[in-house]
């Protein structure tokens, strides 16, 4: 009897102990829940929240690389089309008239940023990338069927670059949401895609056109672009959730009321007036000076191969000593190279060396410019402000190549005036970048800006 009573007491004690443990667990859970309610929500815009690495962040970089390979990489090979159209497909038209195709591509690429940047802020990158993929591939397919100047102008000069703008802007903007300390390096890697595209596409078309003809060369290029853009659509995402807000004129004008943003924009506009002229005319100029066409066909790939390093190495250095410092130096470097090598070049060697050095110097412009804007912008408005920057650059991009064509016509097919203009206008742009850099960080050369 005593033994039975003892067992009952032990069981009762166990039940009480178990109940006490459950009560404590419930109390702890309630306290944790209360703490979680009281804890402030995570702010994705806080500098400490930027991953600056990890699989997800670097997969966005990989997708952005593919996107710029297909968008700006295509733009970087405009020189081979200028030469081909002048000598064959559109040989009945003047150099200045043909250059409007490339100018429209650049204009729409940059002007699209005015709309695409704001749409990105409101809805994110997904639908923009899908629309851009369709328009770019469709435009190239239509160009493969074109036989008249106006048809190529509509397909390659308008339809395709609408898609390119929708591919370029979201890729650049998304990088800024994943990286802060390594933003220059990440932007440089993404921008390197445009350099590699500028290497692959000219060589590919130089080989394909004689073998399968212009129409099928364009179709093969379009299929390659479609494959890479599928990867971009699957990987390019923003870390920051979209913020649907009404668009007002004040939002578009606000950035230009900031002194540093305005000075940076003016400097970039001036620099762009000369930036693309060597890319567009170096191949035609080399053939005019007696370079074998089979060798001249490799000038654009050489230029873009060098820009691969110009987009990555300066971006890495910019993270260490400041993007404005590096960007300004590279702009001066490009201008000096134009004066020192392109202007006096009259044989193969200096033209080839110029292509390599100018590719390295000018490659940093597109790679670091978004980093400059991100540095002086609220991350919540990164899409609008980068879009506004590139949108304004559409104006000098539109007139740049026709101005170069007018100089060529003035020199009766020569390129001296065009070369002098390139050196002078890029030097002026570089000087204005110095002014913008001083506006942000003062005159000290040792300060990281």
Swiss-Prot record:
InterPro entries: MFS (IPR011701), MFS_dom (IPR020846), MFS_trans_sf (IPR036259), Proton-linked_MCT (IPR050327). It is found in: Cell membrane. Its main location: membrane. One of its GO terms (molecular function) is transmembrane transporter activity. Induction: Expression is dramatically up-regulated (29-fold) during the naphthoquinone-producing stage (on potato dextrose agar) compared with the naphthoquinone-nonproducing stage (on complete medium agar). MFS-type transporter that mediates the secretion of the 4 major naphthoquinone derivatives produced, erythrostominone (NQ1), deoxyerythrostominone (NQ2), epierythrostominol (NQ4), and deoxyerythrostominol (NQ5), as well as of 3 newly identified naphthoquinone derivatives termed NQ7, NQ8 and NQ9. This is MFS-type transporter 1. It comes from Ophiocordyceps sp. (strain BCC 1869). The lineage of its organism: Eukaryota, Fungi, Dikarya, Ascomycota, Pezizomycotina.
């Amino acid at each position: 009897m005593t033994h039975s009573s003892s067992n009952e007491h032990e069981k009762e004690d166990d039940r009480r102990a178990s109940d006490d443990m459950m009560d404590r667990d419930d109390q702890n859970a309630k306290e944790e829940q209360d703490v979680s309610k009281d804890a402030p929500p995570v702010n994705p815009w806080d500098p400490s929240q930027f991953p600056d690495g990890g699989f997800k962040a670097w997969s966005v970089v990989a997708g952005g690389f593919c996107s710029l390979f297909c968008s700006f990489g295509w733009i970087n090979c405009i020189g081979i089309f200028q030469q081909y159209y002048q000598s064959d497909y559109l040989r009945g038209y003047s150099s200045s008239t043909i250059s409007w195709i490339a100018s429209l591509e650049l204009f729409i690429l940059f002007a699209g940023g005015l709309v695409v940047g704001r749409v990105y802020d409101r809805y994110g990158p997904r639908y923009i990338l899908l629309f851009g993929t369709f328009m770019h591939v469709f435009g190239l397919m239509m160009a493969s069927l074109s036989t008249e100047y106006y048809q190529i102008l509509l397909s390659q000069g308008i339809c395709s670059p609408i898609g390119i703008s929708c591919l370029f802007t979201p890729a650049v903007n998304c990088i800024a949401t994943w990286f802060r300390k390594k933003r220059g390096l990440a932007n440089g890697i993404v921008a390197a895609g445009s350099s590699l595209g500028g290497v692959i596409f000219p060589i590919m078309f130089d080989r394909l056109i004689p073998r399968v003809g212009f129409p099928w060369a364009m179709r093969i290029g379009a299929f390659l672009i479609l494959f890479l853009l599928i990867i971009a659509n699957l990987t390019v995402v923003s870390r920051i959730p979209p913020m649907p807000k009404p668009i007002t004129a004040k939002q578009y004008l606000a950035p230009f009321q900031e002194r540093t943003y305005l000075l940076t924009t003016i400097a970039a506009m001036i620099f762009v007036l000369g930036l693309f002229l060597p890319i567009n005319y170096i191949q035609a100029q080399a053939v005019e000076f007696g370079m074998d066409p089979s060798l001249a066909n490799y000038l654009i790939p050489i230029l873009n191969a060098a820009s691969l390093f110009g987009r990555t190495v300066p971006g890495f250095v910019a993270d260490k000593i400041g993007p404005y410092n590096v960007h300004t130096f590279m702009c001066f470097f490009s201008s000096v190279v134009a004066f020192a090598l392109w202007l006096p070049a009259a044989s193969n060697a200096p033209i080839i060396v110029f292509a390599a050095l100018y590719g390295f110097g000018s490659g940093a412009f597109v790679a670091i410019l978004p980093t400059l804007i991100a540095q002086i912008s609220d991350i919540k408005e990164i899409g609008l402000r980068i879009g506004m920057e590139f949108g304004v650059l559409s104006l000098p991009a539109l007139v740049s190549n026709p101005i170069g064509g007018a100089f060529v016509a003035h020199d009766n097919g020569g390129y001296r005036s065009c070369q002098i203009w390139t050196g002078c206008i890029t030097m002026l742009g570089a000087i204005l970048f110095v002014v913008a850099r001083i506006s942000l960080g003062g005159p000290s050369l040792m300060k990281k800006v």
